[in-house]
Amino acid sequence: WDPAVARRSMDQALTKLNNNVQGVVSSNDGNAGAAVAALAEQGMAGKVPVSGLDCTVQALQLILLDQMTQSVWRDFDMMAEATAKATVALINEDSLDGIVMGTSPANSAGKEVPMVPVGFYNAVGEAGVQYVIDNDPSITKADVCKGEAAATSFCKG
């Protein structure tokens, strides 16, 4: 979860694999951005698919710059509501039926973990960036259209 560690790991992977990397799947956009930076140093940014999670402003900018393929956006209000319902049920020692909708695969301890699924959207290209801007009150077009991204057709239009 630390972009500095992710960058170091990506640099090491590129060295060990002689730049023979076919794609990067990252658990968050900070680490995806670090992977893009490492790829850029090797002249590979935009040539290797990179995916992230969270649809941060940086990720949306990298998508517009064709350096990141996609990021997954989740509605934080929906996540907060599901968390609040589960928390209240646990505090009141009530059933989680109707809140928990299954289990995740077994974790490293061999135990399945109750799961509360939350809807998501795969933000790809300009349409994906626009979707996030339209649906996430914490991100504006003005935020995204700064720096290098300001020169993209999305930001100029």
Predicted segments with their positions:
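Hinge/beta->alpha junction and helix N-cap segments in small-molecule ligand-binding domains
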Residues: W1-S9, V25-N31, D54-Q58, R74-A80
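Venus flytrap/periplasmic-binding-protein-like
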Residues: G23-T69
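Short, well-structured alpha-helical segments in soluble
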Residues: A4-N20
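Short, hydrophobic secondary-structure boundary micro-motifs
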Residues: G23, S71-V72, G98-V100
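Hinge/cleft segment of the Venus flytrap/periplasmic-binding protein
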Residues: A82-G157
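Extracellular/periplasmic ligand-binding modules, especially the Venus flytrap/periplasmic-binding
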Residues: N28-V36, L64, R74-S95
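Structured segments of extracytoplasmic/periplasmic soluble domains
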Residues: Q12-K16, A38-Q42, L62, D66, ...
